[in-house]
Regions:
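Alpha-solenoid helical repeat scaffolds
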Residues: 70-71, 79-81, 109-110, 152-153, ...
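HEAT/HEAT-like alpha-solenoid repeats
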Residues: 10-18, 50-58, 62, 89-97, ...
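Residue-level detector of extended alpha-helical repeat arrays and alpha-solenoid scaffolds
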Residues: 22-25, 65, 104-105, 146, ...
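Solenoidal tandem-repeat scaffolds enriched in leucines and small polar residues
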Residues: 101, 111-294, 304, 311, ...
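Hydrophobic residues within the alpha-helices of tandem HEAT/HEAT-like
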Residues: 29-36, 68-77, 110-118, 152-158, ...
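Eukaryotic tandem repeat interaction scaffolds
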Residues: 246, 252-413
Length: 503
């Protein structure tokens, strides 16, 4: 800024100390800096400071608070990431604790930008007070401020966390929403390393979370289960829950749901919790906590709409791994009955359930995600998945049934059906079924069908897979390979335009 602008800002700054009507002065400062180059404005603001602007927030008349925030925001925008906190540390501390929402939001945004850009911009020894102040804001009544505080306190350097975790205890004295915010920070920190998890345990947070599952607040319980499920996928997390007896206590709570008038609302959360663990440790969960499997299969068999979508997702998540498939088949008839029920749901349910059931089936049939590249598929899995697929329609031909579903014009159903078809075509027996069913190859190769982009890409991937198959004759393989070469979005119009452009 020119020396004239610098002097002008000094005059405005001085007037803020003496004038009673500060609104015109704040507007003048706003106009002065609004369009000034950042480099020039930064020098002036660094030299003169912002103390008098900040002081405008500390007067009895609060009518100018919003305008003061606007002015401070313009001033802060002239600085690089992290520089505002470095240049005006004491002011940021004051702003973080201000009673006005817009003021706290302004301050926490500056800390947020610094931490997200580069956590090392604010070294812990110098700025620990800032981090402590932000940690206390996870209880903030302004949801936006609280959410930013959660992100900041979850992404600091290691040496900040002992103090941050200590501060989270403040939230435990507040309402369930604030406690959930604190728990989220605790879990985010615990997932970073065993040492930090141990620190969370020593502070009593994990035990407190498990005990809070006895609350009558349904949403609160579900949030805790969601957070604990994230922790349980870590070996040290699940080991603690088992050794501490927490998993046993959570299992007992499932048994009590039938006597709880709100049990129907809670059951989906408990199923998701145990499914997240069973995805990684199916054998141990099936053996030690059979009540989970019983609840899962009962939920599928009952067809209860409040829990069925979650149950389908859970079964698919468990069965997507090879170990999960083998453990499920070892369960015997309850699982077979569940498979048959899912086949019925695919054939006869409304769109939402049909789609969830198709994706569940696809996860159970698929082997690609859990099989080494080009490696052989366990022959037991080949036999199991073939039998499971037949349950799609035992009274008719399962592959003809799938072809019919693939032809349904609704995009979401079609995409889910293609997901199942792709899973089926990961097996030799699946390729053979495609080759056997009249009209299936023609349907796949028909580019005249009006399909959304995602469906065209999904069908293209299936054809690309089948183009490497050994079960089709040379003519069909040639057509498959031509389709692959032309790409998923080729059409006669594309060819016509290309020819016209070449003339």
């Amino acid at each position: 800024m020119s020396s004239q602008d610098l002097e002008q800002f000094r005059i405005f700054n001085k007037k803020l100390e003496t004038e009673k009507d500060i609104k015109p002065i704040l507007n003048a400062i706003k106009s002065l800096f609004d369009y000034k180059p950042a480099a020039e404005a930064k020098i002036t603001l660094s030299n003169v400071g912002i103390s008098n602007i900040v002081r405008c927030l500390n007067v009895q008349d609060k009518s100018n608070d919003d305008l003061t925030c606007e002015v401070l925001k313009i001033c802060f925008e002239k600085f690089g990431v992290g520089d505002v906190v470095k240049h005006f540390t004491s002011h940021i501390m004051y702003l973080l604790r201000h009673e006005k929402n817009c003021v706290r939001r302004l301050a926490v945004d500056e800390v947020y930008k610094s931490v997200i850009a580069d956590v090392s911009l604010l070294p812990v020894p110098e700025y620990i007070d800032i981090f402590v102040a932000v940690a206390q804001m996870v209880c903030d009544k302004d949801v936006g401020v609280a959410n930013k505080a959660i992100i900041i306190t979850s992404n600091l350097q290691f040496e900040a966390y002992p103090k941050v975790l200590e501060e989270m205890k403040i939230a435990l004295e507040h309402n369930s929403s604030s406690k959930c915010n604190a728990y989220e920070v605790v879990i985010n920190i615990s997932l970073k390393s065993y040492e930090l998890f141990k620190l969370s345990v020593d502070n009593g947070y994990i035990e407190h979370m498990v005990e809070e599952l006895k609350s009558n607040d349904v949403l609160y319980q579900l949030n805790i289960l969601e957070l604990l499920s994230r922790l349980s996928v870590k070996p040290y997390g699940i080991n603690y829950l088992v050794k501490d007896g927490a998993l046993e206590r959570i299992t007992a709570l499932i048994g009590d749901l039938r006597n709880n008038p709100l049990g129907g609302l809670l059951l989906p959360g408990y199923i998701k919790f145990f499914a997240s663990i069973a995805h990684y440790y199916p054998k141990e969960i099936f053996e030690k906590y059979p009540i989970f499997l019983n609840s899962l299969f009962n939920a599928i068999e009952s067809g209860e709409q409040t829990v069925l979508p979650v149950a389908l997702d859970a079964l698919g998540f468990i069965g997507i791994t090879i170990e999960g498939k083998l453990c499920l088949t070892a369960v015997g008839s309850p699982f077979i009955q569940a498979i048959e029920k899912i086949g019925q749901l695919i054939r006869n349910s409304p769109a939402e359930i049909k789609i969830r059931a198709l994706y569940c089936y696809a996860s159970l049939i698929s082997v690609e995600k859990d099989t080494p590249s080009q490696g052989p598929v366990d022959h037991r899995v080949t036999l199991m998945t073939r039998e499971w697929f037949r349950s799609l329609n035992k009274e008719s031909d399962a592959m003809e049934t799938l072809l019919g579903i693939c032809k349904i014009p609704f995009p979401d159903i079609k995409l889910a059906a293609y997901s199942l078809l792709d899973a089926v075509c990961q097996h030799l027996w699946g390729e053979e079924l495609v080759a056997r069913v009249a009209g299936f190859v023609e349907f796949l190769l028909d580019r005249s069908i009006n399909e959304p982009k995602e469906a065209k890409e999904a069908k293209y991937d299936i054809i690309k897979r089948l183009s490497q198959s050994s079960v089709f004759d040379d003519n069909i393989l040639t057509r498959f390979k031509t389709y692959v070469k032309e790409g998923p979005f080729y059409s006669d119009t594309t060819l016509q335009v290309a020819m016209e452009e070449g003339n």
